[in-house]
Amino acid sequence: MQRLRRLRKSALLRRTFAETRVDCGKLVYPVFVVWGENKKEAVPSMPGVFRYSVDRLGEVVDEMLAAGVAGTMLFGIPEHKDAVGSGAYADDGVVPQAIRYIKKYCAARGRELLVIADVCLCEYTSHGHCGVLERGDVENDASLPLHAKAAAAYARAGADMVAPSS
């Protein structure tokens, strides 16, 4: 009888081909945050996913905590858009408000939730691109400082991580 042990030959091979275990404690749930009050709107392209106004975030936070989800990644949907995506880096923007709300909500319950903020300008710009446009192209040198301003605004609000998705 021949037993093939080549995938168990070394620690590196064993780690590489070991079973992967996924549980809620390793997952991050996306949350889309909109301006306004008392809003919970379905995201048509993502069944079971909703856009929440800040005042309704407690509902989804409770669900995440009950399921044992490790954290959330916040995506902002601004009320107004402009050419430079200024809503992304406003300290009173929808994402910084959501970060502060979630941190306070969890602290009041003696719980923790990892809060990650998406750092991208495309949702905040009137043209839908992830940066400043010059002659129809994204100008990286002009855009990077705006991404940095957004990341700093989220950090000031209390985000545990920022995640550039541009």
Task: Please give the residue ranges for each predicted region.
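Short amphipathic alpha-helices and their capping/turn segments at secondary-structure boundaries
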Residues: 12-22, 54, 58-68, 96-111
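N-terminal small/glycine-rich loop or linker at the start of catalytic domains
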Residues: 22-49, 113-138
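Structural preference for beta-strand elements that scaffold enzyme active sites
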Residues: 26-30, 71-73, 112-116, 153, ...
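Conserved, mostly hydrophobic/aromatic
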Residues: 31, 57, 64, 118, ...
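Glycine-rich, proline-tolerant flexible connector loops at the mouths of alpha/beta enzymes
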Residues: 40-52, 67-95, 161-166
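Short, acidic/polar
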Residues: 54-62, 142-152
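Alpha-helix-loop-beta-strand connector modules within alpha/beta enzyme cores
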Residues: 82-119
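Acidic, His- and aromatic-enriched active-site or binding-groove loops in soluble protein domains
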Residues: 95-100, 136-148
